[in-house]
Structure formats: structure tokens, C-alpha cells
């Protein structure tokens, strides 16, 4: 397993992306809390992310994992890579994702790499531009991946056969 990756009781891959300490200033001083950003995936095209907040780190991680499991989305993959290039925004974070030839590996940094690892993508070229805020990068990555359509879905929407669509 990759560094920081675990497998849950339900067989899903879990990955912790970031933990952040936050403070709320009150009359008597500061109250500290923690936030956690996690991704979970089945390694076969389903992925979800979660953001949890709590006074203690383990509780924040647990909340994030539960939210990630509850919001899993399906991504149509083409074997170990993506079907076609995708660009997606969230806030001022912009992500490019492009299919790669077999043996390339995951060429992506930071939060994007964790998403691809739990999703089951093995060969991809990806770049994040603009804001590198992990929450926005993960959201842009997952939304971009979920926005991809399979050839069957495109053919059905256009009222054509898959052969006509794929040429």
C-alpha cells in the first residue's frame, strides 16, 4: 500500500490528504480544533472525498471518512487510465487531466495524486494551476472526473450507435 493509505473494513482504500489546525478566538483565549481532508475509493472507478472538523484529530478524520463514503461518485475509466483529456475548475483552482500510455504512472502532485491512487487510475498526466488549496484541488479533480461520459452515454444522448461516436 502507498504511504498513508489504508484499507477500510468495507474494502475501500482510504487516504488522508491533509490535517489542519484551526483556532477560534473567544473571550478567554483561543479554542483549537482540527480539520481533515480525506479521499476514499474502491480502486475500480468509484471515488469520494470528505472534509471533517472536530476538536480532536481522530474525530475529524473519522467524520471526513464518513462523508467521503457517503458521497462516492462513479468515474468511467478506460482500463488503467482516463478516456479523454479533461479540464475542470473549482474556485481559482484549475486542473488538467490527460490519459497516458501504459507504464507512465501517475504524474500528478499533491492532492490530485491521492485521488488517482484510490480511484484505481495507474497511468495519467495531471497538472493543477492557480490556487493549490487542497480542498479546491480535490473538488475540481473529483468533479472533473465525474463529469466524464462513457461512449455509451454520449451515443445514447445523441441518438447514435457507439460505433458512429467512436469512429
From Swiss-Prot:
Keywords: Ribonucleoprotein, Ribosomal protein, RNA-binding, rRNA-binding. InterPro entries: Ribosomal_Su5_D2-typ_SF, Ribosomal_uS5, Ribosomal_uS5_bac-type, Ribosomal_uS5_C, Ribosomal_uS5_N, Ribosomal_uS5_N_CS, Ribsml_uS5_D2-typ_fold_subgr. Residues 12-75 form the S5 DRBM domain. PROSITE patterns: RIBOSOMAL_S5, S5_DSRBD. It comes from the Bacteria. GO terms for cellular component: small ribosomal subunit. GO terms for biological process: translation. Transmembrane segments: none annotated. GO terms for molecular function: rRNA binding; structural constituent of ribosome. With S4 and S12 plays an important role in translational accuracy. Part of the 30S ribosomal subunit. Contacts proteins S4 and S8. The N-terminal domain interacts with the head of the 30S subunit; the C-terminal domain interacts with the body and contacts protein S4. The interaction surface between S4 and S5 is involved in control of translational fidelity. Belongs to the universal ribosomal protein uS5 family. NCBIfam families: rpsE_bact. This is Small ribosomal subunit protein uS5. The gene is rpsE.
Amino acid at each position: 500500500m502507498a504511504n498513508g493509505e489504508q484499507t477500510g473494513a468495507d474494502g475501500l482504500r482510504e487516504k488522508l490528504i491533509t490535517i489542519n489546525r484551526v483556532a477560534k478566538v473567544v473571550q478567554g483565549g483561543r479554542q483549537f480544533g482540527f480539520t481533515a481532508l480525506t479521499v476514499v475509493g474502491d480502486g475500480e472507478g468509484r471515488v469520494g472525498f470528505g472534509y471533517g472538523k472536530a476538536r480532536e484529530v481522530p474525530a475529524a478524520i473519522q467524520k471526513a471518512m464518513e462523508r467521503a463514503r457517503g458521497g462516492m461518485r462513479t468515474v468511467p475509466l478506460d482500463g488503467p487510465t482516463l478516456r479523454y483529456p479533461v479540464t475542470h475548475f473549482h474556485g481559482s483552482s484549475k486542473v488538467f487531466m490527460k490519459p497516458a500510455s501504459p507504464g507512465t504512472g501517475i504524474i500528478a502532485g499533491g492532492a490530485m495524486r491521492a485521488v488517482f491512487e484510490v480511484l484505481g487510475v495507474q497511468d495519467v498526466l495531471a497538472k493543477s494551476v492557480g490556487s493549490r488549496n487542497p480542498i479546491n484541488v480535490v473538488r475540481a479533480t473529483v468533479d472533473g472526473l465525474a463529469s466524464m461520459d462513457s461512449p455509451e452515454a454520449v451515443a445514447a444522448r445523441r441518438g447514435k450507435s457507439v460505433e458512429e461516436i467512436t469512429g
